[in-house]
Amino acid sequence: PYEEIQTHEKILKDVLKKVDKNAELTIAGSYRRKVSDSGDIDVLLKSDDKTVYTRFVKMLSKEEYLIDDLAFGRKKYNGVSKLEGGVGRRIDIMYTTPQEYPFAILYFTGSKDFNLMMRQVANDKGYTLNEYNIEKYSSDKKNRVKNIIDPEGEKIKVEKDIFEFLEMEYREPCDRL
């Protein structure tokens, strides 16, 4: 439930502050879309320091917030978290750099249908869009341009910039059905 995820969010942010005061996290997925019933917890961890991700997951385990590990990869953790007295919840923690973050938050907020629509708009304009970047489509990988520059010459820095680049009206997460 939404209220329970709010409690998870507070715990996660408190632990992250102990690990690195400069790192940030956002709970994405259905929680960010304000859906009343969230089955799992999708956490995006943003930092310039790649070691923050590993230290964060280890600290969550040490504090017995994470009760079961399903997978612990280079950039993504899958496991089970549990509040004191609560039930186990599936949790995914994804590490992202600040440069990848706008694309990651767009993708992991969803919904699946909304992501498919955004990718189709990008394709129709000659681009490929994924959770890492947007590229000018080219069958020759050497000629792909990563993290597209917008018309004013600024890199895409926030989620809204992706909508603007694709000439789309920004949609709040709760409107991404």
Kindly give the residue locations of the regions a language model identified.
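Alpha-helical interaction/regulatory segments in DNA maintenance proteins
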Residues: 1-16, 70-73
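Generic non-transmembrane alpha-helical segments
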Residues: 11-20, 55-63
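A short linear-motif detector with a strong N-terminal bias
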Residues: 4-6, 21-25, 58-59
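Acidic, metal-coordinating catalytic segment for phosphate/diphosphate chemistry
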Residues: 49-177
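Hydrophobic alpha-helical scaffolding
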Residues: 1-6, 46, 108, 152
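Active-site nucleotide-donor binding segment shared across nucleotidyl transfer reactions
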Residues: 13-51
